């Protein structure tokens, strides 16, 4: 006589399924990947949108939930699931790493440097791009270039207020360095009326253009595409690309954003980190060859005017270069002169702290 399956049978089946799913979950790690709505992170957004079109690269992203969750696929097999996290700035990215709420991310090299100096266990993996930063004034401002800005700052009766999106952002640090080299006294204290320029923290990129439009600040300094968007919306004018700041040639090919990973992620999932670095490096090369399409895809992803994204003059780097390292060393010098470093980076050059800042084993293995 046939007996109905008992409770024990169902318990055993449930346990078996749990074990199978547990093994599967262990094989496919779920990692949180942070990025910012900026054209500096175009390669990651392009990789997500192109998907299987990049299959020939040997590594690509397959959407699970578009713009939210993706599988990292290698030779047709998923090796990880990426949960995308949009951050407001490099400073927030570093803070999320410190709280163990990110595994991989893209952010400015200066933000990652600052985080590592504070003791956050993470490493720079590879470069993303150089340049793509500008100083923007309101459309009706009489200022036309760097020299007219300096003249105005020296004659103004109170500090000229310039907004930035993050205290550890590359645009803010470059501008501050250039101002000081030009003999301009800079402060972040609104009560310091002896200064000629007041730098104001606007907290995130989305606040920059509204602050400029409302005359909350007299200028903004930030990464692409925000200077270009200000122009496209008729709100502002770019009076200087930061690469052209004095001294002549000093700021050319200056580093900005990088990829980074927590030390824990590197230790636990080196195979995933390797393929993530490979994907970004190969997509960087693709973006350099397909600038128009890359700009269009970025505009669609972020929700920008297409002309603004396409106007970004960025150079994406598949590998570290000598000029990139020289620029990173200049950042170290500037940040030390400002007294920003209190930890292991204090008083050091880039060569002295490479093992502290970088894990280059992954990018060194990438064949383009």
Could you say what each language-model-derived stretch is?
Residues 10-19:
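Bacterial N-terminal signal peptides
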Residues 24-32, 55-57, 77, 143-161, ...:
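Immediate post-signal peptide segment of exported/extracytoplasmic ligand-binding proteins
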Residues 65-95, 108, 186-214, 223-225:
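Short helix-initiation/N-cap motifs at beta->coil->alpha
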Residues 110, 204-298:
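Pocket-lining segment of extracytoplasmic ligand-binding domains
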Residues 267-342:
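Secondary-structure end/capping motifs
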Residues 336-368:
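Conserved C-terminal helix/tail region of periplasmic/extracytoplasmic solute-binding proteins
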